[in-house]
């Protein structure tokens, strides 16, 4: 499968190590470009409004504003932009809450990184259809 245009991704995570790893993961893929990074939910919202990404990858547990609160605001401001919650938490309650908010996919940090790319592509293809 190939996409006709590169899709922009915003990475939001308070861990500089995770942000860097995710940026490198997406940059290795020919059909993605990382348009920006943010270290908390509030900064993520600001950058999303300025950069208008095709996809946003959010951590759950962050200072200033967590991933759930940021997702609520982002879904109001940019309802068509898919959100992926990339989190260490795997609880059913967190998954249920994420679905209620409108988070499109949940990927555990314990999963192989290819799962994140696979789900990102799936969301962007379904959004384009």
List where the protein language model places each region.
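Active-site beta3 strand of CheY-like receiver
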Residues: 51-57
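Conserved phosphotransfer cores of two-component systems
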Residues: 49-51, 73-80, 101
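Acidic catalytic/metal-coordinating carboxylates
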Residues: 40-43, 66-69
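Conserved acidic segment of CheY-like receiver
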Residues: 5-18, 22-26
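Non-catalytic signal-transmission and effector/linker regions of two-component phosphorelay proteins
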Residues: 1-8, 114-129
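Receiver (REC) domain active-site loop signature in two-component systems and cognate sites
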Residues: 62
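Alpha4 helix (beta4-alpha4-beta5 surface) of REC/receiver domains from two-component response regulators
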Residues: 69, 90-107, 111, 115-118, ...
């Amino acid at each position: 499968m190939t996409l006709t245009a590169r899709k922009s991704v915003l990475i939001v995570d308070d861990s500089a190590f995770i942000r860097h790893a995710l940026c490198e993961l997406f940059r290795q893929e020919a059909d993605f470009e990382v348009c920006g990074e943010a270290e908390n939910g509030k900064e993520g919202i600001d950058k999303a409004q300025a950069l208008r990404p095709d996809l946003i990858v959010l951590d759950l547990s962050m200072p200033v504003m967590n991933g759930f609160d940021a997702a609520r605001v982002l879904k109001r401001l940019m309802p068509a932009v898919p959100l992926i919650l990339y989190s260490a938490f795997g609880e059913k309650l967190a998954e249920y809450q994420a679905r209620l908010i409108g988070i499109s996919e949940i990927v555990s940090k314990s999963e192989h990184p290819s799962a994140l790319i696979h789900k990102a592509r799936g969301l962007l293809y379904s959004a384009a259809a």
